[in-house]
Amino acid sequence: MPADTPAGSAPARFDPAQIEPKWRAAWDLAGTFTATPDPAKQKYYVLEMFPYPSGRIHMGHVRNYTMGDVIARYKASCGFSVLHPMGWDAFGMPAENAAMATGGHPKDWTYANIAEMRAQMKPLGLSIDWSREFATCDEAYYGQQQSMFLDFLEKGLVYRKNAVVNWDPVDMTVLANEQVIDGKGWRSGAEVERRELTQWFFKISDFADDLLSALDGLENWPEKVRLMQANWIGKSRGLEFAFARTDGGDPIPVYTTRPDTLMGASFVGISPGHPIAKALAAQRPEVADFLAEVARGGTTEAALETAPKLGFDTGITVRHPLDPNWELPVWIANFILMDYGTGAIFACPAHDQRDLDFCRKYDLPVIDTFFALDDPTPVGDTAFVPPKTEPVRWVEHFAGLDIATGQEAIEATIDFAEAAGWGRGVEQFRLRDWGLSRQRYWGCPIPVVHCDKCGVVPERKENLPIALPYDEDGRPIDFSIPGNPLDRHPSWRDCACPACGAPARRETDTMDTFVDSSWYFARFTAPRAETPTDPAEVGYWMNVDQYIGGVEHAILHLLYSRFFARAMHLCGHLPESAREPFDALFTQGMVTHAIYKTTGTDGRPVYHYPEEVETTEEGAVLKKTGAPVDIVPSAKMSKSKNNVVDPLAIIDAYGADTARWFVMSDSPPERDVEWTASGAEAAFKHLGRVWRLAEDLRRNAEEAATAGSAEEARALARASARAIAEVTAGIEGFAFNKSVAKLYEFTNTIQKSKAPRAEKRAALKTMAQLMSPMTPHLAEEVWSMLGGIGLVAEAPWPEADPALLVEDTVTLPIQINGKRRSELAVPKDMPREEVEKLALADAAVLKALAGGAPRKLIVVPGRIVNVVI
């Protein structure tokens, strides 16, 4: 064994329990993964979305962080200066819930969980620079967050207003629209209510157009994520005009994206939060009762879309803008949002299902404004809502249209209204400002003070951080009482005004936890800096070159982070180049497992852990009783369904490399992977086979090097070159499963080869380098066994000799509609069908197809691939 690698005899068998800790200690001793800026090197910043410290890692963590680790290790071997950090998204309600349940403290619970999870993650062998670790509940972190809040406030990016909010009655806090799922709180599951409170908001809407247009430049993001964000931002062009009231009251302005359907208007609807509704409620008890009833429903579009339609006839009428003799009733309707458009609409039930349901319920008229070209049947119980691009036949359209698409009619109507002087075309966005106030203890305090003399006063930066109190004047904080403990903490709450020194009161709301995760990527570049970022460090490390995480964060976290990067740039904390913080995004699939269930005596399903079940040729049975078990294949791992696999148990039984190898091997990383015991066993056996190959070559190192033919040696060299090329391509293209498949094949080739032992040793050392990103511990062991110098983690990535690839491969240009867009390196003798499969999997082809199929796919063997769309 070389002198600069860990001492100790090689094990007599493949023993991960002996091998893996040894090499982790070696990496730590050498400081292998310490990120250091080096102007002479190109940098690479790889980041996985950091975890919430629940106290236990799961297989999803293993897959997610292994993916990032493969990229980080590969890039380091390619000569990049790599930043691969880890931290903890540590604020939030679960810690307070735990305190309520156990009588403990959220801080103690959180930091204990962090220690547990760190200890569980380190055995995975991740190439993380742990010296940069932080938790968002660290005072040093949220103190800098408070400093940025004050910067945002100074720039006009934060403001305070009364707003109807989503109130979670169980967690007793406000939820952002994105945190309300099907009308329920995303954590508690409670029915969300409407309440009007004074809240703090980030002015994300100021950036709506920029956030939307910049999506086109995110070419290395999944198209589905960009589409989800575009839909959430929701840019639309419509008509703004006002209905004149017949009683002489103030006109009612409306905004509509379908002004072409104005002749089908049935009523004017106003939001429960509209000034007219509020004024009526103050005068009429029946209106106040109605508003109280609808306040018990959710406030989001999704919640209101599915909720029963409720309305109240105000008795007010308005005049139609095209016919002053045509009067429309004004209804308060629970499905109308106050913070989109003007809080008032006109309803066209024939061409909007929501409006139609409302009109059928309250017996209001339904007027068709257009029909399908071949079907003049009036609307029944289903609204006729064709795509805007589909031509339809119009019923006496006031702009003179007969047959036209909806989009053409919209533009014609806007032109008509502007020419007539009663309306104007405007653009609107669905994206609304981000309400960040939360009525909870375990979050970042908002650094402002309320003074009777001065009003709302920003805290002085020299007083930051405004730290959370650990106790209440020496007594434990009682988290069992509903509400925010900070409201009940006078020694923390009561303070001097930073402006005049008079008695004042701290803001007791804390920040939404999505604030914490909206800038952590920048903090990792200089986690101990006395300012939010350090110009030199952030200038070197940003942007994040590769970001990895679940698609469930497409709207909440990713959109907020894009906003924060822009706001941080405006305040001088990020350079212009970092306004889009993530250059590339990869959204991984889940780790799944079969569900095993029987039926209980009460008829309800009983779920069983995988270790309680034995699978036979006839099916599955319980080990204890032999009772038959129903199997639900490949479901998301869930504690409630008992189909979870404990990563720690897998590591204890097989080693971390087996877990890493399996989650990389079985499926493309963007798809779900099903964990099976047989798959884990097969992965372990394969790694043992690689170890035995190395052990055999180590023990017989002195055998004559002349054994084996020159042709066998050349064949093995060609196989090594192909393995280097294909494993490299797989890692570069996030096709880790293809890299693993090639390494399986390469193992077989080495094992069967009759080449001289020196050549086999060289091939297996190459194998160790290629396996290092996936199975780093075994790779180090094999590298050491075969006389490799230093650590394989620090060895340069092998390069394939082009001469050894020439005779076996050919590069085919890929033309899309006659223009060269990509190329494909394939074996010369690859069947046409295999070339077609690879061509259809090419990134440029996938992007051009956009989920569709090509009209033609023409492969000219050895020359070109033509894709016709």
From Swiss-Prot:
<feature type="short sequence motif" description="'HIGH' region">
    <location>
        <begin position="51"/>
        <end position="61"/>
    </location>
</feature>
<keyword id="KW-0648">Protein biosynthesis</keyword>
<dbReference type="Pfam" id="PF08264">
    <property type="entry name" value="Anticodon_1"/>
</dbReference>
<keyword id="KW-0547">Nucleotide-binding</keyword>
<dbReference type="InterPro" id="IPR009008">
    <property type="entry name" value="Val/Leu/Ile-tRNA-synth_edit"/>
</dbReference>
<keyword id="KW-0067">ATP-binding</keyword>
<protein>
    <recommendedName>
        <fullName>Leucine--tRNA ligase</fullName>
        <ecNumber>6.1.1.4</ecNumber>
    </recommendedName>
</protein>
<keyword id="KW-0963">Cytoplasm</keyword>
<feature type="binding site">
    <location>
        <position position="639"/>
    </location>
    <ligand>
        <name>ATP</name>
    </ligand>
</feature>
<keyword id="KW-0436">Ligase</keyword>
<dbReference type="InterPro" id="IPR002300">
    <property type="entry name" value="aa-tRNA-synth_Ia"/>
</dbReference>
<dbReference type="GO" id="GO:0004823">
    <property type="term" value="F:leucine-tRNA ligase activity"/>
</dbReference>
<feature type="short sequence motif" description="'KMSKS' region">
    <location>
        <begin position="636"/>
        <end position="640"/>
    </location>
</feature>
<dbReference type="InterPro" id="IPR001412">
    <property type="entry name" value="aa-tRNA-synth_I_CS"/>
</dbReference>
<dbReference type="InterPro" id="IPR025709">
    <property type="entry name" value="Leu_tRNA-synth_edit"/>
</dbReference>
<dbReference type="InterPro" id="IPR002302">
    <property type="entry name" value="Leu-tRNA-ligase"/>
</dbReference>
<dbReference type="Pfam" id="PF13603">
    <property type="entry name" value="tRNA-synt_1_2"/>
</dbReference>
<dbReference type="GO" id="GO:0002161">
    <property type="term" value="F:aminoacyl-tRNA deacylase activity"/>
</dbReference>
<dbReference type="Pfam" id="PF09334">
    <property type="entry name" value="tRNA-synt_1g"/>
</dbReference>
<dbReference type="InterPro" id="IPR013155">
    <property type="entry name" value="M/V/L/I-tRNA-synth_anticd-bd"/>
</dbReference>
<dbReference type="Pfam" id="PF00133">
    <property type="entry name" value="tRNA-synt_1"/>
</dbReference>
<keyword id="KW-0030">Aminoacyl-tRNA synthetase</keyword>
<dbReference type="InterPro" id="IPR014729">
    <property type="entry name" value="Rossmann-like_a/b/a_fold"/>
</dbReference>
<comment type="similarity">
    <text>Belongs to the class-I aminoacyl-tRNA synthetase family.</text>
</comment>
<dbReference type="InterPro" id="IPR009080">
    <property type="entry name" value="tRNAsynth_Ia_anticodon-bd"/>
</dbReference>
<dbReference type="GO" id="GO:0006429">
    <property type="term" value="P:leucyl-tRNA aminoacylation"/>
</dbReference>
<dbReference type="GO" id="GO:0005829">
    <property type="term" value="C:cytosol"/>
</dbReference>
<dbReference type="InterPro" id="IPR015413">
    <property type="entry name" value="Methionyl/Leucyl_tRNA_Synth"/>
</dbReference>
<dbReference type="GO" id="GO:0005524">
    <property type="term" value="F:ATP binding"/>
</dbReference>
